[in-house]
Each structure stands twice: as structure tokens, then as C-alpha cells.
């Protein structure tokens, strides 16, 4: 999950530089939230006594169309959402997972909104 959050954070922050206005602000905020999720997951990993996780850096984004990159992000968001929801009953970290699931759900909605507002050639 950490690697997927890192990939999403990198994608959103990169895409925020490729668009303007409201769309850029939305992507910037989503990128920051994904960075927060990544830090929380690393913190849990550390508290569980597993040390610091070794996470490979995300692949650099290609210059693919924005719509295609957002579709990839949507898939990762859905996978993370399922993982967080399944862990939301954890007695120790359940509330954290529930909050992250709520944010992932909102990211899915925002991605769909962004996809719906893109010009046909993007």
C-alpha cells in the first residue's frame, strides 16, 4: 500500500503542474493527502516493530494523456480503498484506516470529476 500511495502522490503532484486553475489545486491537495497516507502507513509499520519499510521509488510518469494517467490513479485508489476498508475494524489502527478510506473515496470522486471535465483530446 505504501508504494501505491507514493505512486499516487507523485502522479497527482506531477499532473498538478500539467493543468491549471481549480484542477491543479485539486490534484495538489490530493497529492499532499497521499503523502500523508504514506507517512501514516510508514509510522504503523515502524510501530509494529518492523523497522523502516524498503519501498521502491515510483516509476517516472510518462507523457501519456492526462486522462490515461488519471485512470491508472483511479485503479490504485480503488485498491487502496478496499485495503483500508478491510482494515477499518482493526482495534489499534482501525480509526486511521477508516479516515484514509474516507479520503480515498473522495479521491475516487474527484478523479471522476476531473475525467469528466477534461477536453476530449486530453
Range-by-range predicted roles:
Residues 1-122:
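Non-heme di-metal
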Amino acid at each position: 500500500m505504501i508504494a501505491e500511495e507514493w505512486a499516487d502522490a507523485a502522479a497527482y503532484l506531477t499532473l498538478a503542474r500539467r493543468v491549471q486553475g481549480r484542477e491543479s489545486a485539486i490534484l495538489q491537495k490530493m497529492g499532499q493527502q497521499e503523502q500523508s497516507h504514506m507517512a501514516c502507513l510508514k509510522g504503523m509499520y515502524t510501530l509494529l516493530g518492523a523497522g523502516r519499510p524498503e519501498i521502491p521509488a515510483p516509476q517516472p510518469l510518462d507523457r501519456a494523456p492526462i486522462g490515461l494517467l488519471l485512470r491508472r490513479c483511479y485503479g490504485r485508489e480503488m485498491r487502496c480503498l478496499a485495503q483500508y476498508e478491510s482494515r477499518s475494524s482493526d482495534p489499534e489502527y482501525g480509526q486511521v484506516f477508516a479516515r484514509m478510506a474516507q479520503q480515498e473515496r473522495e479521491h475516487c470522486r474527484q478523479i471522476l470529476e476531473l475525467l469528466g471535465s477534461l477536453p476530449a483530446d486530453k
